[in-house]
């Protein structure tokens, strides 16, 4: 974990959830969850979960038969997301987008809310996303502005 990633510990996850989620992230999370639900996936991977705003929206909008795996590089963010919880079971797992700990072709959809622009090697991370997607799978992500790879 880099020093920047370590900075998101202590009170930061709670402050992030309390202030930034309602001001910035909630609306986009709902949009990504709606788009994901429209694809009727069986298995969804969320990368850069943060405090779980997208995870909660996915859990509410996807059928209980859809498996959701929520990952983040920062354990403190995952801990905050777990503490808040979801409306149904979700697998929470620390993971690095540069080296996803999943078998090839294991997810129907990969969702990344405002995380891609922070990947130190975007091409490598997106290669990992492609690797874990099933043939015909979908990647849904958003960024603040343009993205350069």
Where are these regions (language model features)?
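A short acidic, Gly/Pro-enriched loop at the edge of an enzyme's catalytic core
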Residues: 98-110
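Conserved class I S-adenosyl-L-methionine
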Residues: 138-149
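A short SAM/SAH-binding and catalytic strip from SAM-dependent methyltransferases
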Residues: 108-122, 145
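N-terminal, positively charged/glycine-rich alpha-helical extensions of SAM-dependent methyltransferases
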Residues: 1-14
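A short glycine-rich, Lys/Arg-flanked "PGG" loop and its adjoining helix->strand segment in the class I
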Residues: 123-138
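Conserved alpha-helix/loop element of class I SAM-dependent methyltransferases that forms part
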Residues: 22-42, 57
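Class I SAM-dependent methyltransferase SAM/SAH-binding core
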Residues: 43-100, 124
């Amino acid at each position: 974990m880099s020093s920047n990633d370590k900075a998101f510990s202590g009170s930061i996850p709670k402050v992030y959830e309390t202030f930034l989620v309602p001001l910035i992230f909630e609306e986009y999370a709902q949009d990504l969850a709606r788009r994901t639900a429209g694809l009727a996936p069986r298995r969804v991977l969320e990368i850069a979960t943060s405090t779980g705003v997208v995870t909660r929206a996915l859990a509410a909008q996807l059928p209980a038969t859809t498996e959701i795996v929520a990952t983040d590089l920062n354990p403190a963010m995952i801990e905050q997301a777990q503490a808040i919880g979801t409306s149904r079971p979700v697998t929470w797992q620390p993971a690095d987008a540069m080296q996803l700990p999943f078998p090839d072709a294991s997810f129907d959809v990969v969702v990344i809310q405002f995380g891609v622009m922070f990947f130190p090697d975007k091409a490598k991370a997106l290669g990992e996303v492609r690797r874990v997607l099933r043939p015909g799978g979908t990647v849904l992500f958003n960024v603040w502005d343009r993205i350069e790879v």
